């Protein structure tokens, strides 16, 4: 990194090692003309309302947060000579009493030509692990002791949550075209020799293997490049190592070679991440340009956010590719706030964290390096240290290492960082939240964490609407950092009617912890909407790409670009009782949803209010689970008001919305009682996999029965039942395989009656066959597909395949067949009672439970069926 302003420390902290570590080895970056952040002053308008919902989770990594971190280079290379400073750093940044970081990005230095002396910083001349002599390469495992010394201590401090990622800034100098690990003679061209891609991969893999097998370092991931598609890595640089790789073939080749080398050493389970571009927008282009093989090899996208702004697009790129996404490096000398003093750099950092996490939905956020400045009168290795910084101005890092005093000097930027890192912990579920807030939910411990910053010189009032949770506590604990406080206990704030109203202090960052929070049960019964039944107003300039039909196309990346008096409406085909509503605003235009209304109607003319968007929603899907009681209808409409909105940006309300989702059941099926089978049987799954018939009754639409030709699945309800409905969900992505499928019922499991068939391709949701008016009594229910080739035009398979995700059977159990003594079980004692009755040696109090074949009499046939039932149990 480039040295920037000096900083004046505000305190010294020494911390003991507890059982936590969070080390992140972040790769080097350069100061760009502008950072990819908002930089705006944030003062919430009077009682700004923010809805927090357990359903509005980040889409990346299933919403699961992996943690916070920093790069170990270069600061660990500088402080690691001193066990005392190394330990203080581990405690300060990774320990329980410190930042509680848990990710360390460890730099595998390439190592420059020993004859070179152009790097002037005391910390950034990273050693390599090889020595080169007349074409002969030998490994020196004593190299890089300093960084390794810090890493080990950080791992001990962080504990079980620790994640280590290896990364490279440059290959060894002798593998480069320029003969220099700082870059090429032309910074815009590849600097790795064309015949050294495999050699470079071997180098990275061998070092990783040694760290794992010789030093016991558990490596989660490795990335071979750092800001590769830039033009500022040039030979003789005074700053650091760096290497240009072209996007496309060059980056693909190094990824695939690294995959080979890691697999060869039995390290194929280590994630290969890519490609740590300096800009969000460049990262999008770089990933898209990878070969299909390289994309498959990449387990996670790592991006820096020094430039670019297309966070939502990169999120979608990662999501559509099935990849995790990290914000793996950023920092800078920015400031924020009004007359904020020492808080200015920390408020800037808070903005960056909030923008990056909410915009990217990243599962980890990693600072470049926590220490960027060093104080030492003697310097280091003949070079002069940068000295202290002015903490009221922008500076890189969060702390300064004073080697003369053997101290770590902390700043407000450090404490602002800790408002996030200490309380939003690995494993929590990240929730999308609006404006100046970052939110996480710990479902295991029933805890909600909200972090909010205020960059205004006056107080800022906010209200957090927690009504979408099933339960929430009675108060929130507040922890605050301001110009006068560091992680201070700011008391408790009462929660009234699921509403948390707070007043943010001027130029402050506050963390709110709410205990006793529960919610987020899986949404079921998603209603399929046929695009042919979607109508609406005209889009802006009659653009045929952004029409109202985009609102129900299943993608939050597309949108309806409606204008003033705009609306979109869907005909559901029949009346539904709604249990939940989901909507996604157009990305970047979330403010246009404020004031929008959702309406419901039985006839498409007379409308009732379903929900009004009272404040700017968050990006992504927003789910509303507390709708008016007993609300039902056939038509759903979203519209915006007339006139000028209060957003201060548009002259008229614009109907901009990306997606709408609806959940519920057909109106006549709202009081259905589920019947649990006592036994499930079926045909064999494809290749005898674990996706057997039991998956059709495991309660999850995510699993499925992978049955093949002539396949079937049967449920034994344990007794005669009056059936009201059968629900079913097709296997996702293979919905067409349910077309022509049939449902049968039986009293005895031998004689079957067809009660329903699937006449169209069903949606991936719960679909229903209504049996309430058919007076159907049965003990067994079976789903099966026809024999032979599909007799329809939409199924491309050569044979019908019995693929189904879930089946639900609804009704009432009339009595447990076989439970002759009425104790709730069928067992040998029931067999004995029935046999005595048939021999005239006793009576039956519940004779109907012994009538297993439902012929209105108890005879030897029932005795045989009861014996079979008990044996099968």
Question: What is each stretch, according to the model?
Answer:
Residues 21-22, 32-42, 665-668, 812-873:
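Cellulosome-associated attachment modules in secreted, modular CAZymes
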Residues 493-518:
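C-terminal beta-strand-rich structural cap/linker in extracellular carbohydrate-active enzymes
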Residues 199-206, 210-218, 228-333:
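Active-site neighborhood of glycoside hydrolase catalytic domains
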Residues 47-220, 224, 256:
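N-terminal catalytic cores of secreted or lumenal carbohydrate-active enzymes
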Residues 398-447, 484, 520, 556, ...:
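Glycan-recognition and catalytic regions of carbohydrate-active enzymes
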Residues 422, 432-474, 507:
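Carbohydrate-binding surface patches
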Residues 327-416, 432-433:
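Aromatic/acidic polysaccharide-binding cleft in carbohydrate-active enzymes
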Residues 552-611, 617-670, 684, 697-756, ...:
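Aromatic, loop-rich ligand-recognition surfaces of beta-strand-rich domains
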